[in-house]
Amino acid sequence: MALFRKRKHLDSETMKNGAKLITLANPQSVISEQFRNIRTNINFMNVDKEVKTIAFTSAMASAGKSTVSANVSITMAQAGKKTILIDADLRRPTLHSTFNVSNSNGLTTLLTSRSKEMDANSVIRESGVENLSILTAGPIPPNPSELLSSKHMVDLIEDLKQEYDMVVIDLAPILDAAETQQLTSSLDGTILVVRQAHSQKSAVKRAVELLKLTKSPILGYVMNDVDADGDEGYGYGYGYGYGYGYGYGYGEEEEKKGLFGRKK
């Protein structure tokens, strides 16, 4: 589980201005290092099984999944991995705002095209970050579930796996969107983002149950919006699957402090 400092009005800011790219604005910050630690933990998953397609989702809206997915994608690109970040939250897309690009064409353009031979490169954009490409959501459709569960979507991901080292997908909250359940089952893994004092425990538990029901590999979970020892406190940890966590806390004077022990 990765822990991030509490921010005010995170969701409204994200919807209006896009996710905050702290890994670009302040790459030497503690929080940027936390995002790099998440990247490292994902890399560890490659030991037993190749992990090239991952999704970030949450139980409910406003957990911060778009911020986490964007910043982790940047750290992957900074590490030299050719990465593409896809905004597949077709209900509340934010990627175009994050990178300040047009959303007139995007994922939905590809999925609704009558020509199955439409070149994905015609709607994939450069992010301005070396090694990172982005595919915005495109116009919001009336049928997101049908589009994302289509064979066209599965084929698109398979094609992108051949072109990129990492395919990162920002998905709608799993309890709000049936398409998230369907799509995660075809990916190498899913990371669940949880926002402290916002995400209800019962909702998080149900989200995990749904992922397990669809046999979606759960790579871990990220805890967001956490107060750690006051206003200057930060924390980091990473949970493997559901029910195990460890971490370190960071502050102005104290560099490391245990926050979590093993959960049984």
Residue positions per predicted region:
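P-loop NTP-binding module
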Residues: 1-264
